[in-house]
Amino acid sequence: MNKVRISAFHVVFFIFIVSNVGGALTPIGDPPLFIGYLRGVPFFWLLERVFTSWLVTAAAILAVFYCFDRRSFARMPRAPRADAEQADTWRFEGGINILFLLVIIGAVFLPDTFFLREAVMLAAATTSYFLTPKTVHAVNSFSFGPIKEVAFLFIGIFTTMMPALGYLAVHGVEFGFTRPLQYYFASGALSAVLDNAPTYVNFLQLAESTARAANPAAFAGAAVGSVAAVQILLVQQPAFVVAVSLGAVFFGAMTYIGNGPNFMVKSIAHDAGVHCPSFFGYIFKYSLPILLPILILVGLLFV
């Protein structure tokens, strides 16, 4: 494994790929898409439309990671390199948690009645915690510290960002967004510096308002922000929804605060003794020179 040579860039590329870009296909991959699913976007709707752009983005990031990793390995002193090349022995414990993971995934498809979905997810997570042997938690350095840290941070972010997003919801149509690429870069820019989940919701609302203004007859009888209105939007302007989805998910990787899991990964890695870039080091050393050009190119090619 990589435990003898894990570096800051391993954490960064994990955030790029696993916490963000990798989850762009379905609602269980990233929080914004799950919110879209709750608002009326069918589960596999996005998968059918973004697979190529997702594949190109992920492949480009993985190619850059491969170059980083090869260079890092080549620069290692001989003794650590010999340790890294030796076959590791490992064992799999806590297999019961696969069952609970499947329960949580299955709960996504439950009807939203009396918070049944959320109750099943919470029950599965709680049961998993108490049934997992404490030795497994100890070996994996499990603690609630990163979860608490992220919770407090994003309470502050949500509190301060709501006025800006509220203004966007009311006056967004005045900006004249009429092309998918505008939605891609605008939702991406805000997702990079704010949390991408509420940003997605606001731009989905903006897309609906724009489409409603262009063709009010198509939205007749559908309340603003309703499931019916979102489903009409999927027919009238599917490219807008694709652009907002990709912008929110992809650009959420630009900073630690762009997506909730980003900061959690950083906190877990830090607690495990792994060196992580600072907030601005992450941006100026990795996301701006590496990720941003890839996302711009993908937007120009596919959105």
List each model region and its residues:
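Transmembrane helical segments that form the transport core of multi-pass membrane transport proteins
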Residues: 101-211
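Interfacial loop-to-helix junctions that mark the boundaries of transmembrane helices
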Residues: 43-53, 88-92, 109-121, 141-145, ...
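Transmembrane helix-loop junctions at the membrane interface of multipass transporters and ion channels
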Residues: 30-45, 104-115, 301-303
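Small-residue-rich segments of transmembrane alpha-helices in multi-pass membrane proteins
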Residues: 15-24, 82-89, 98-99, 147-161, ...
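Long, contiguous bundles of hydrophobic transmembrane helices that form the permeation core
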Residues: 60-111, 118-121
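Juxtamembrane and boundary regions of transmembrane helices in multi-pass small-molecule transporters
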Residues: 3-9, 13, 25-26, 35, ...
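Predominantly late transmembrane helices and immediately cytosolic-facing juxtamembrane segments
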Residues: 61-82, 126-136, 151-157, 164, ...
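Membrane-interfacial helix-loop connectors
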Residues: 1-6, 10-18, 35-51, 162-254, ...
